[in-house]
Amino acid sequence: MMVVMMRHLLIAIAVVVCAACSPASPTARLNENFVLSPGESTSVSGTNVIVRFVGVQGDSRCPADAVCIQGGDAIVRVEVLPSTGGATTYDLHTANSQPVRHVDVFIALVELAPYPFVSRPTQPGDYRATLRVTR
C-alpha cells in the first residue's frame, strides 16, 4: 500500500514539475536577421528587449502576378517589450523600410514574406517577418 502511494505521489510531482516547465524563449542575436511568425516573440541577446511580431496591418503591395502603377506597401506591427515592463508598438513599412529607434536599439524590417499573388490570397498566419535589431 505504501509503495503504491509513493508511486502516485512521484507521478503527481513529475506532472506538476513538467507542467511548470515552459519551452525556452528563442533568442535572436544582435545585428543578425531573425524570422518571426505572427504572435511569435524573441529576446535579443545583448539587449534588454523582447520583440514580438503582432501581425500585418495592411498589405497593398502589388501582387507578383499583376501589373500595377505603384509598388504599394505592407505594414508590419511589432511590439517591443523591455525587461523593465511597458510595451511599445511600432509600425514598420516595406515601402519605406526605415528602422525605428527604441531606447538604445534600432528595429528594422528586412523582408516580409510571402509576396502577394492575386491567384493565391495570403492568410494572416502565413506571413513571416524578417527583422534585425542593431545598436
Predicted feature locations:
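Mature extracytoplasmic domains of secretory-pathway proteins
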Residues: 50-93
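Bacterial signal peptide processing site
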Residues: 22-25
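Post-signal peptide N-terminal segment of mature Sec-exported envelope proteins
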Residues: 28-49
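Short Fe-S-cluster ligation motifs
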Residues: 92-111
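Envelope-exposed proteins and targeting segments
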Residues: 40, 47-49, 72-76, 88, ...
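Positively charged n-region of N-terminal signal peptides that target proteins for export
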Residues: 2-9
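Short, exposed beta-strand-loop hairpins at the edges of beta-sheets
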Residues: 108-126, 130-133
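C-terminal motif of bacterial Sec signal peptides marking the signal peptidase cleavage site
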Residues: 17-20
